[in-house]
Amino acid sequence: MQDSNNRYAKRGVSSSKQEVHDVVDHMDKGLFPGTFCKVTEDLLTGDPERCNVIHSDGAGTKSILAYISYMENGDPKVFHGIAQDSIVMNLDDLACVGVWDRVVLSSTVNRNARNFPGEVLAALIEGTEDFLQNLRDLGVDVQSGGGETADVGDITGTVAVDSCAVAIPFRSQIINNSNITPGLSIIGFASDGQSSYERTENSGIGSNGLTSARHELLSKHYYQNYPETFDPKTDQEYVYCGPYQMDDPLKNSNLTVGQALLSPTRTYVPLLKEIYQNIGKDLKGAVHCSGGGQTKCLRFGSGVRFIKDNLFNPPPIFQEIKAVSGTTDEEMHQVYNMGHRLEIFCKPEHADKVIEISANFNIDAKTIGRTERTMSENGKNQLEIRSENKTLKYG
């Protein structure tokens, strides 16, 4: 078992991005401070009843896994899932502020043209259009606004897939996480399984923590054969240091390791839209547990102590990452979603209705905790993740 002290940072990645927050936290917070995404006044049309939301995100280093799969198997359609990853990372963030209709999306592909040929680019574009149509079929109005393909071989040895989404919603529909206060139930929605609108089983991995997941699980075979897929300045001890190849079965799962790592990020937008239509403003807050994993909630609300004492059992992909790497529980919950990638905050009397709605989408949901008043002397938010064996404290 290797040293688990901040393994993510040793690969050049920060789960907290504290240095980024140190800068942006002093900038204008927009029309509704406290929302999951920044919301501005309607600068595009000038409508006083509307506002603007614009958001950028992407598939991160998950595209490297698709690249490896393509190089070994020759099937460019593996990039269909990467297209979905990039889109979902934007749309699900927007959904956490109440935006899910009349969204225009643009995509940017930064590639090494030598390693990422035209047939793969075509598959990526095809995957984008296919997923957007699936969303529209589910009642989520998202349209493509085009995109950009940049050949930047000196920047990347493979490919980076990013998206940007913009909408002009009514101010009245915005979900403001500043309404997260003591006395609320926290409802978690499973990231694994197979929802009613997914074509295959989902491992729950999402699009966060993939740098560590890839290196912790995959073997030196990939270090030797794909030097373009990692930073040469990273200590070799932390590069492809796992026991598996992509086609190996994942323990306690129906998926291979590669399938689990490449499992397309589930969108919760149809579910969250349905919940909002049923309980309206009694949906006090929503958090997409992406970067920062289970600690993401700490950035929202004020004077809140988040108690999570009924989490889902971690899906097999997270169990195996921990088993082979020795990563601490503290770091696992900061890097990975650990079983639920969306949580909402509502009064306890609405919990059963929310869980019932989720069941209609075949997504497991349950009350995973509650909010209390912070015990910090300076009013700072706190988080406790409790299990039978230990309590993890953050904040």
Task: Identify the function of each model-found stretch.
Residues 1-395:
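Helix-biased detector of long, well-ordered alpha-helical tracts
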